[in-house]
Amino acid sequence: MAEIRRKLVIVGDGACGKTCLLIVFSKGTFPEVYVPTVFENYVADVEVDGKHVELALWDTAGQEDYDRLRPLSYPDSHVILICFAVDSPDSLDNVQEKWISEVLHFCQGLPIILVGCKKDLRHDPKTIEELNKTSQKPVTPEQGEEVRKKIGAYKYLECSARTNEGVREVFEAATRAALLTKTHKSKKKCSIL
């Protein structure tokens, strides 16, 4: 049993891949049907650097309807994942226009990991065709890294819940970042003001 417990909160636009990422990591199966999330919690045991960590995974709704409810998930967090979809440049724009300000308001000082979800769609012909209709292209790794620098995130990672590529790496990086927060002299926790 893990004696170290950490809390992770995942945020980002609706339908950008947050819930699938959590379900694939915690349960090992990809949900084929999209059901919008209100709030869901999962727990996963993660081992990093010889440490067993019980990671509480707090899923949140990205839709605007839940903007007033979402902050209730932030208190006592140790790490935040801000997600966007590689097949949705608008969701990356929203990282800078919406998500980073919300996270910094409620969770200043916590490590943030920027996650590009749906990496498998970057070279998908149907996705490219759809984006071309609006003169857009899938987000590149370089664009993701550029936004990471702008928002001051700890790390930028990409994954595909559908193919399971990069999923474990996201949560190992998040766990490492969450463990770093305990080494600070003052306890940095999220609070609602």
UniProtKB/Swiss-Prot annotation:
Membrane topology (UniProt): Lipid-anchor
Primary location class: membrane
Claim: Cytoplasm is one of the keywords in the record: no
Subcellular location field: Cell membrane
Residues with lipid group (S-geranylgeranyl cysteine): C190
GN (gene name): rhoA
Keyword Membrane: yes
Function comment: Has a role in cell polarity, primary and secondary germ tube emergence and cell wall deposition.
Example of a GO cellular component annotation carried by this entry: plasma membrane
Family listed: Belongs to the small GTPase superfamily. Rho family.
Record GO terms (molecular function): GTP binding; GTPase activity; protein kinase binding
Residue positions where Cysteine methyl ester is found in the record: C190
Official protein name in the record: GTP-binding protein rhoA
Motif mapping: Effector region: 34-42
Residues excised as propeptide: 191-193
InterPro entries: P-loop_NTPase, Small_GTP-bd, Small_GTPase, Small_GTPase_Rho
Residues annotated as binding GTP: 12-19, 59-63, 117-120
GO biological process: actin filament organization; fungal-type cell wall organization; hyphal growth; regulation of actin cytoskeleton organization; signal transduction; small GTPase-mediated signal transduction
UniProt KW keywords: Cell membrane, GTP-binding, Lipoprotein, Membrane, Methylation, Nucleotide-binding, Prenylation
